[in-house]
Protein backbone atom coordinates (compact mmCIF):
# COMPACT_ATOMS: atom_id res chain seq x y z
CA UNK A 1 0.00 0.00 0.00
CA UNK A 2 1.51 3.32 -1.08
CA UNK A 3 1.49 6.09 1.51
CA UNK A 4 -0.28 9.28 0.35
CA UNK A 5 1.92 12.33 -0.20
CA UNK A 6 0.42 15.82 -0.09
CA UNK A 7 2.84 18.49 -1.34
CA UNK A 8 2.31 22.23 -1.46
CA UNK A 9 4.16 24.34 -4.02
CA UNK A 10 4.20 27.93 -2.82
CA UNK A 11 5.88 29.20 -5.99
CA UNK A 12 6.97 32.87 -5.55
CA UNK A 13 4.74 33.78 -2.62
CA UNK A 14 5.08 34.90 1.02
CA UNK A 15 7.57 36.90 3.03
CA UNK A 16 9.90 35.19 5.48
CA UNK A 17 7.69 36.16 8.41
CA UNK A 18 4.60 34.79 6.65
CA UNK A 19 6.38 31.56 5.76
CA UNK A 20 7.61 30.93 9.29
CA UNK A 21 4.17 31.73 10.72
CA UNK A 22 2.61 29.21 8.33
CA UNK A 23 4.90 26.44 9.55
CA UNK A 24 4.28 27.39 13.18
CA UNK A 25 0.54 27.24 12.54
CA UNK A 26 0.47 23.83 10.84
CA UNK A 27 3.39 21.80 12.19
CA UNK A 28 1.57 20.54 15.25
CA UNK A 29 -1.52 19.57 13.30
CA UNK A 30 -0.28 17.59 10.31
CA UNK A 31 -1.08 13.86 10.43
CA UNK A 32 1.60 11.38 11.51
CA UNK A 33 4.15 10.64 8.79
CA UNK A 34 3.35 6.95 8.96
CA UNK A 35 -0.14 7.80 7.68
CA UNK A 36 0.46 10.59 5.16
CA UNK A 37 3.51 12.57 4.05
CA UNK A 38 3.02 16.34 4.31
CA UNK A 39 5.42 18.55 2.34
CA UNK A 40 5.76 22.30 1.81
CA UNK A 41 8.00 23.40 -1.07
CA UNK A 42 9.06 26.97 -0.37
CA UNK A 43 11.28 29.64 -1.99
CA UNK A 44 15.01 29.15 -1.45
CA UNK A 45 15.39 32.13 0.89
CA UNK A 46 13.05 30.61 3.46
CA UNK A 47 14.29 27.03 3.52
CA UNK A 48 16.82 27.30 6.35
CA UNK A 49 14.34 28.91 8.74
CA UNK A 50 11.51 26.58 7.75
CA UNK A 51 13.59 23.45 8.26
CA UNK A 52 14.47 24.73 11.73
CA UNK A 53 10.85 25.60 12.49
CA UNK A 54 9.60 22.17 11.36
CA UNK A 55 12.36 20.20 13.09
CA UNK A 56 11.06 17.30 15.13
CA UNK A 57 7.62 17.38 13.51
CA UNK A 58 5.97 15.42 10.71
CA UNK A 59 6.07 18.37 8.29
CA UNK A 60 8.72 18.01 5.58
CA UNK A 61 10.29 20.95 3.75
CA UNK A 62 11.10 20.91 0.04
CA UNK A 63 12.60 23.17 -2.61
CA UNK A 64 11.02 24.15 -5.92
CA UNK A 65 14.02 23.49 -8.18
CA UNK A 66 17.81 23.22 -8.05
CA UNK A 67 20.85 23.06 -10.30
CA UNK A 68 22.36 19.69 -11.19
CA UNK A 69 25.96 20.64 -10.30
CA UNK A 70 27.32 20.49 -6.77
CA UNK A 71 29.13 23.81 -7.22
CA UNK A 72 30.54 26.06 -9.92
CA UNK A 73 30.14 29.25 -11.91
CA UNK A 74 26.34 29.20 -12.10
CA UNK A 75 25.30 32.67 -11.01
CA UNK A 76 22.08 32.72 -9.05
CA UNK A 77 21.72 28.94 -8.83
CA UNK A 78 21.35 26.64 -5.82
CA UNK A 79 22.97 23.20 -5.71
CA UNK A 80 21.72 19.87 -4.32
CA UNK A 81 24.59 19.96 -1.82
CA UNK A 82 23.32 23.28 -0.48
CA UNK A 83 19.78 21.96 -0.13
CA UNK A 84 20.91 18.79 1.61
CA UNK A 85 23.09 20.82 3.97
CA UNK A 86 20.04 22.83 5.03
CA UNK A 87 18.06 19.69 5.82
CA UNK A 88 15.70 19.89 2.86
CA UNK A 89 14.02 16.56 2.06
CA UNK A 90 12.16 17.00 -1.25
CA UNK A 91 12.75 19.00 -4.43
CA UNK A 92 10.34 19.69 -7.30
CA UNK A 93 12.00 19.13 -10.67
CA UNK A 94 10.78 19.86 -14.19
CA UNK A 95 7.72 21.91 -13.29
CA UNK A 96 6.04 23.23 -16.44
CA UNK A 97 6.72 26.81 -15.35
CA UNK A 98 10.43 26.00 -15.24
CA UNK A 99 10.22 24.34 -18.64
CA UNK A 100 8.24 27.17 -20.25
CA UNK A 101 9.78 30.25 -18.61
CA UNK A 102 13.34 29.11 -17.97
CA UNK A 103 13.93 26.78 -20.92
CA UNK A 104 14.42 23.60 -18.91
CA UNK A 105 14.56 20.55 -21.16
CA UNK A 106 13.94 16.87 -20.52
CA UNK A 107 17.71 16.37 -20.55
CA UNK A 108 18.24 19.08 -17.93
CA UNK A 109 15.52 17.60 -15.76
CA UNK A 110 17.20 14.19 -15.98
CA UNK A 111 20.52 15.65 -14.83
CA UNK A 112 18.75 17.19 -11.86
CA UNK A 113 16.96 13.95 -11.00
CA UNK A 114 20.25 12.03 -11.01
CA UNK A 115 21.89 14.74 -8.90
CA UNK A 116 19.03 14.68 -6.39
CA UNK A 117 19.47 10.98 -5.76
CA UNK A 118 23.25 11.34 -5.57
CA UNK A 119 22.82 13.86 -2.76
CA UNK A 120 20.01 12.13 -0.90
CA UNK A 121 17.11 14.33 -1.96
CA UNK A 122 13.73 12.95 -3.05
CA UNK A 123 12.64 14.40 -6.40
CA UNK A 124 9.06 15.29 -7.25
CA UNK A 125 9.32 14.98 -11.02
CA UNK A 126 6.71 16.90 -13.00
CA UNK A 127 5.23 15.96 -16.34
CA UNK A 128 2.19 17.08 -18.29
CA UNK A 129 0.76 18.03 -21.64
CA UNK A 130 -0.32 21.36 -23.12
CA UNK A 131 -3.90 22.04 -24.20
CA UNK A 132 -2.86 21.66 -27.84
CA UNK A 133 -1.25 18.29 -27.16
CA UNK A 134 -4.30 17.16 -25.24
CA UNK A 135 -6.69 18.17 -28.02
CA UNK A 136 -4.47 16.33 -30.52
CA UNK A 137 -4.76 13.13 -28.50
CA UNK A 138 -1.07 13.17 -27.56
CA UNK A 139 -1.36 13.18 -23.76
CA UNK A 140 -0.10 9.64 -23.15
CA UNK A 141 2.73 9.96 -25.65
CA UNK A 142 3.88 13.29 -24.22
CA UNK A 143 3.93 12.21 -20.58
CA UNK A 144 5.51 8.85 -21.44
CA UNK A 145 8.36 10.61 -23.22
CA UNK A 146 8.88 13.06 -20.36
CA UNK A 147 8.88 10.29 -17.75
CA UNK A 148 11.20 8.01 -19.71
CA UNK A 149 13.74 10.81 -20.22
CA UNK A 150 13.50 12.07 -16.64
CA UNK A 151 14.14 8.63 -15.13
CA UNK A 152 16.96 7.60 -17.48
CA UNK A 153 19.97 6.24 -15.60
CA UNK A 154 18.16 5.48 -12.35
CA UNK A 155 18.05 2.08 -10.72
CA UNK A 156 14.74 0.37 -9.87
CA UNK A 157 15.46 0.97 -6.18
CA UNK A 158 15.86 4.70 -6.79
CA UNK A 159 12.68 4.81 -8.85
CA UNK A 160 10.77 3.28 -5.93
CA UNK A 161 11.68 6.34 -3.85
CA UNK A 162 10.79 8.92 -6.48
CA UNK A 163 7.57 10.90 -6.85
CA UNK A 164 6.06 11.76 -10.22
CA UNK A 165 3.57 14.62 -10.44
CA UNK A 166 1.23 14.62 -13.43
CA UNK A 167 0.29 18.26 -13.97
CA UNK A 168 -1.55 19.02 -17.21
CA UNK A 169 -0.28 22.45 -18.17
CA UNK A 170 -3.74 23.70 -19.09
CA UNK A 171 -4.98 23.00 -15.54
CA UNK A 172 -2.25 24.77 -13.55
CA UNK A 173 -3.54 27.92 -11.89
CA UNK A 174 -6.46 28.21 -14.30
CA UNK A 175 -9.27 26.97 -12.11
CA UNK A 176 -9.76 24.16 -14.63
CA UNK A 177 -9.13 20.62 -13.53
CA UNK A 178 -8.89 17.27 -15.21
CA UNK A 179 -11.67 14.95 -14.14
CA UNK A 180 -10.56 12.47 -11.47
CA UNK A 181 -11.16 9.64 -13.92
CA UNK A 182 -9.06 11.22 -16.67
CA UNK A 183 -6.27 12.02 -14.23
CA UNK A 184 -6.37 8.46 -12.94
CA UNK A 185 -6.10 7.13 -16.48
CA UNK A 186 -2.99 9.19 -17.23
CA UNK A 187 -1.41 8.30 -13.88
CA UNK A 188 -2.08 4.66 -14.67
CA UNK A 189 -0.36 5.10 -18.02
CA UNK A 190 2.64 6.64 -16.24
CA UNK A 191 2.77 3.64 -13.92
CA UNK A 192 2.72 1.30 -16.92
CA UNK A 193 5.65 3.21 -18.43
CA UNK A 194 7.59 2.80 -15.18
CA UNK A 195 6.74 -0.91 -15.15
CA UNK A 196 8.04 -1.35 -18.69
CA UNK A 197 11.28 0.47 -17.90
CA UNK A 198 12.01 -0.67 -14.34
CA UNK A 199 9.73 -3.60 -13.57
CA UNK A 200 6.41 -4.10 -11.76
CA UNK A 201 7.84 -3.71 -8.25
CA UNK A 202 9.16 -0.23 -9.01
CA UNK A 203 5.89 0.68 -10.71
CA UNK A 204 3.87 -0.44 -7.72
CA UNK A 205 6.07 1.47 -5.27
CA UNK A 206 6.51 4.81 -7.04
CA UNK A 207 4.11 7.50 -5.88
CA UNK A 208 2.25 9.43 -8.56
CA UNK A 209 0.57 12.73 -7.77
CA UNK A 210 -1.97 14.78 -9.69
CA UNK A 211 -1.62 18.55 -9.82
CA UNK A 212 -3.91 21.12 -11.39
CA UNK A 213 -6.38 23.23 -9.39
CA UNK A 214 -6.70 20.71 -6.55
CA UNK A 215 -8.55 22.20 -3.57
CA UNK A 216 -10.08 20.99 -0.31
CA UNK A 217 -13.47 20.62 -1.98
CA UNK A 218 -12.24 18.26 -4.72
CA UNK A 219 -9.18 16.50 -3.28
CA UNK A 220 -11.11 13.46 -2.07
CA UNK A 221 -12.40 12.80 -5.58
CA UNK A 222 -8.79 12.52 -6.76
CA UNK A 223 -7.55 10.56 -3.76
CA UNK A 224 -10.31 8.01 -4.33
CA UNK A 225 -8.68 7.05 -7.63
CA UNK A 226 -6.52 3.93 -7.52
CA UNK A 227 -3.52 5.34 -9.39
CA UNK A 228 -3.33 8.75 -7.65
CA UNK A 229 -1.26 8.89 -4.46
CA UNK A 230 -1.87 12.52 -3.59
CA UNK A 231 -1.79 16.02 -5.06
CA UNK A 232 0.87 18.59 -5.84
CA UNK A 233 -1.00 21.75 -4.86
CA UNK A 234 -0.35 25.40 -5.68
CA UNK A 235 -2.72 28.11 -4.49
CA UNK A 236 -4.65 25.92 -2.06
CA UNK A 237 -1.44 25.25 -0.10
CA UNK A 238 -0.81 28.89 0.79
CA UNK A 239 -3.21 29.17 3.74
CA UNK A 240 -2.72 27.01 6.85
CA UNK A 241 -6.38 26.03 7.17
CA UNK A 242 -6.60 24.97 3.53
CA UNK A 243 -3.32 23.03 3.66
CA UNK A 244 -4.42 21.19 6.79
CA UNK A 245 -7.70 20.23 5.11
CA UNK A 246 -5.69 18.78 2.23
CA UNK A 247 -3.36 16.69 4.38
CA UNK A 248 -6.22 15.54 6.58
CA UNK A 249 -8.01 14.28 3.47
CA UNK A 250 -4.92 12.24 2.64
CA UNK A 251 -4.97 10.72 6.09
CA UNK A 252 -8.32 9.09 5.49
CA UNK A 253 -7.58 7.55 2.10
Swiss-Prot record:
GO terms for biological process: gluconeogenesis; glyceraldehyde-3-phosphate biosynthetic process; glycerol catabolic process; glycolytic process. Optimum temperature is 60 degrees Celsius. Thermostable. Its main location: cytoplasm. It catalyses: D-glyceraldehyde 3-phosphate = dihydroxyacetone phosphate. Substrate binds at residues 9-11, 173, 213, 234-235. It is found in: Cytoplasm. It comes from the Bacteria. Pathway: Carbohydrate biosynthesis; gluconeogenesis; Carbohydrate degradation; glycolysis; D-glyceraldehyde 3-phosphate from glycerone phosphate: step 1/1. Its EC number is 5.3.1.1. One of its GO terms (molecular function) is triose-phosphate isomerase activity. The active site is at 95 (electrophile), 167 (proton acceptor). Belongs to the triosephosphate isomerase family. Involved in the gluconeogenesis. Catalyzes stereospecifically the conversion of dihydroxyacetone phosphate (DHAP) to D-glyceraldehyde-3-phosphate (G3P). Homodimer. This is Triosephosphate isomerase. The lineage of its organism: Bacteria, Bacillati, Bacillota, Bacilli, Bacillales.
Amino acid sequence: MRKPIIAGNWKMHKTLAEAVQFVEDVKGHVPPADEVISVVCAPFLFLDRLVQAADGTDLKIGAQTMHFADQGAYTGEVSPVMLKDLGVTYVILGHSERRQMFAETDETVNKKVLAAFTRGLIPIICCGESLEEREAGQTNAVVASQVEKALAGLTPEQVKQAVIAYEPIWAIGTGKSSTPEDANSVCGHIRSVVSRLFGPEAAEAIRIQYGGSVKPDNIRDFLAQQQIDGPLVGGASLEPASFLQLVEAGRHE
